[in-house]
Amino acid sequence: MRTILEQIILGIFLLIVGSGITSAQQLNMGDILPQDTSVRVGKLDNGMRYYLRHNAKSTGLADFYIVYDVGSVQEEDSQNGLAHFLEHMMFNGTKHFPGDSMIRWLESIGMQFGTNLNAATGMEMTYYQLTQVPLKRESIVDSMLLILHDWSGYLALEDKKIDKERGVIVEELRQRNNAQFRVGNKAAASVFGDTRHAHRNMLGTEEFLRTFDPQVLRDFYKCWYRPDLQAIVIVGDFDVNEMEGKLKKVMADIPVAQHPKAKEVIRIPDNATPVVAVITDPEQQTCNANFYIRRAAVPKELNNRVGATYMNMMIHVATAMMNVRFGELAQQEGCPFASARLQNVPLTNTCDALELQVVARGNAIAEAFTSAYGELERVRRFGFTEEELEQVRTGILRGGKYAYETAGERENGMLVWECINHYVKNVPLMSPRHKWAVTQLMLAKQMTLQQVNEL
């Protein structure tokens, strides 16, 4: 018997309704879901992508983001920590904002460092944000675009500024050196195998942070922080046509990368036998077990297809039903686990996993994990019931209807992340109406208990 995933790949047909998804139209699982026309999506000649969206919810305000499709895994073994170090240097001088003039100017218009001006570096994605920007003068918009322009490829990266920041990041490393950080680093080899994901702790080591040559940081920046790996996302109370014109003008002088280095596709190797790791830490307050069932992720180019969305919906339904069971069991007297949860997690761009998280009552972790895993095995053998499916389906539909009815109340940040997920992962960027139509038909018309149980 073919699995549901195999059936999706071979092509199951769905009846989808709505503008662009009509009742007379049957879409194959390989069909692309319609994109929200209220988002202006474009690409500049230098390869930079952009997403612009008007949102009147926050009157007179806008969020400005630059997103990089790179992160710590682009570091070589001798560069561990450079991506995060660059995050700090974004605020330490650029072509048009020397020294700390950027922060001082932003504060002069009412923005706060750490709240409205911030950044985050991940394993495979990095972003820098300017949020709740007051659009009270046209010159403010021009300056925001100029900041994004400089972040794209015009950091000063002066030796004295780099040396000054070394101690700041070393102190951050010391502050983060808690039980969660240490346990996570030790567990990485078991989860990610012998890959870069297992050998990057985001911050680096104190020795490296204090001694690396500043030119190494400049070379890393020039190699990876380039327009073909970047996207600008701007959402707020502005005219999209005017913003697009300004964006194109400001970013026009950013050159196309010459001889760009290709991003390595990193795949997590399969293991012939189960990998088991026992990790202890004197500051760990709870006794936990995490169990991963890895699988290849849907390729990025297929993520905006009907089939990927349908598969994700079935996984969402199955994990929700499983978690209802766990919740009921945890309330029973004598249950060895305080909590248990099953969730789908994207480990990397190429690898997803079903993760079972178990927190024991006291230190009885073996009994707690055995109990939770036993329930998971029971579902694998005997499946869920129609009553369980109906309960979860009703809850998801209720939430979907509420999201559709309140779509006009979404803040800029929520709309920004829809664009970011489309850029980085190719997650469907659907309108609320299309999303609600798809949700209803997948749950109410197409999905069956047999399909979920065979997943």
PLM features per residue range, with description:
Residues 28-66:
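Mature N-terminal segment immediately following signal peptide/propeptide cleavage
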Residues 59-60, 68-182, 196, 201, ...:
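Active-site-adjacent, His/Asp/Glu-enriched structural segments that form or flank metal-binding
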